[in-house]
Amino acid sequence: MKAKDVETRERILAAGGALMWKHGISRITVGEICRKAGVSKMTFNKHFENKVAVAKAVLQRSVDELWNKVVEIMDRPIPFHDKVGLYIQLRLEQTEAWSQEIARELLEDSIPGMAEFVNGLRQSILDKTIAMFRHFQETGDIRRDIKPEFLLSMLNRLTETAKDRDLMALYPSFQTFVKEIMEFLFYGMLPGARA
């Protein structure tokens, strides 16, 4: 692909992504994407079949970037519980960028073919995350007798807990709140020695 074509494709993706994250997929048009990207519809059609194709490319890129950040966090030379805290914070930042409209569209099957695509992305991330947990079991960072699928479920629930604004208001800062969540994950509610 020529440099100009790559640049044009990137402009379309950036414009489509900005509109999609703000308004959802259903409420935007190819015309709006073209105007924001500064391209004609003919140029758009040279790169993408329709707005759903743009949405899929934006989502794929978003998931790839998220996973690269997860790998970067997990490769840091810091204690494992700090890695998990950064992971939860990253997940929160990721979901804050999504409008309610896009979240609803991706969870429901309101756009033909999108639910299947999103399920494929989700399964890919789940498989990678479980493989990562197994690696940390082998290195001794996670108990070997706990199922990785259980850990994944608990992390998802803790991420949801971290979105609770009423609960967050009980703490002086978001960092203190996340620390409490992490300490609960690692040490439970019983008093005792902490690492």
Descriptions of predicted regions:
Residues 38-48:
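Short hydrophobic/aromatic patch on the recognition helix
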Residues 137-183, 193-195:
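Hydrophobic/aromatic-rich alpha-helical bundle segments in the mid-to-C-terminal region
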Residues 22-26, 77, 139:
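Short coil/turn segments at alpha/beta junctions that flank glycine-rich nucleotide-binding fingerprints
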Residues 57, 61, 68-97, 151-155:
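Hydrophobic alpha-helical connector segments
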Residues 1-23, 27-36, 53:
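Basic, helix-initiating cap at the start of DNA-binding domains
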Residues 90-128:
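Short secondary-structure transition hinges
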Residues 5, 55, 59, 63, ...:
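Amphipathic, non-transmembrane alpha-helical scaffold segments
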